[in-house]
Amino acid sequence: MLKKQWNCTKSYLNADLALYGEELNADSDLRCKIAREAATLLYFGAEKEYKQAKLKAANTLGVHFLPSNFEVALELDKIAEETEGPARKERLIQMRKEALKMMKKLKKYGPILIGSVWRGTIRQGSDIDIALYHDVPDEILNVLKSDVKISKTEWTTVTKRGKPETSFHIYVETAGKQMAELVVRSSEEAGCKRKCEIFGDELKGLNVQELERLLKENPAQKFIPV
């Protein structure tokens, strides 16, 4: 009798687990659909911010939960690869070479390649992002003037973890017709660890030596956490 009751209980448990597994798979599939929709909105310019793209995608699909920025970023990378094809890889390598030229010119300011050119996740409209560390931005502007076209400069302040962070942004066009944004932070911030708001890992980037080695050994390598 006890054995029969246990077999019945076991059957119910297995049925419940199977149903739970189906629900998890359904949720996972739906998260992928929302992430894909949000990534599509970002790629084709319908939205510029991840949060707004996710909210709009969830509303379109009639759901009340959102995927992570990381999930959207992975879908965005897939869309870029599907849409742009082999030319994307060649453009990435060219952008990394252009970045290296600027970084060598600005080597004394501790340049670090960051953003999508570092990650290897560029898409149409991506620019080169380089972080610099110095207390006198005008000095960097003077170094740049002979090699690039400076289109805009501005101071920006953002609040992170309750503290204001100020940086000087320089927008340029390189000799190779690539657009770049140079972010100048204070010298005391050099070496400070920063967390990526999209991928959730540490924003390590590449210095001059690391970028040179990358271009020799694996020029199209991606840096995406697994």
Task: For each feature predicted by the language model, list its residue ranges.
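Catalytic core of pol beta-like nucleotidyltransferases
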Residues: 2, 6-8, 17-47, 51-124, ...
